[in-house]
Amino acid sequence: QFYTDNKSFQLVFDRITTKWLADDTDPDGVEGWSRFKARVEQALRLITAEIDKNSRVIIFSSGGVISTALHLATGMSPYNAIRTGWRLVNTSITKFGYGRSGLVLHTFNSYPHLEYCQSGELITYR
């Protein structure tokens, strides 16, 4: 039987994510967690190396990258950061600061620009 409801999807997605985070290999056609995390860290290093302390940078990205940055900034476990990222609203705003202590989370999953619609129809996920 083929399940297409959100609850079934989430169950499968959780199992796959758990395996992805635990397995340090790169399965055929899939970038492993360690490599993905290293790529996100490298991108953040490149960006922060190019700016001065008064700069503002806007990055448009996916939930996976935002969740990985959340993990890096807070020390939250990769699993909990990814799970937290599952609640990211499409077009939400997450703000990080960068200084001597590294990456710091300022705002997570803010979406005041979508809350004007009373029905909530603009608030979507994934």
Model regions and ranges:
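Generic structural signal for well-ordered alpha-helical scaffold segments
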Residues: 41-49
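Acidic, low-complexity terminal tails and accessory targeting/binding regions
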Residues: 2-4, 34, 49, 53-56, ...
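Short, well-ordered beta-to-alpha junction loops that form the rim of enzyme active sites
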Residues: 59-64
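Phosphate-handling substructures
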Residues: 1-39
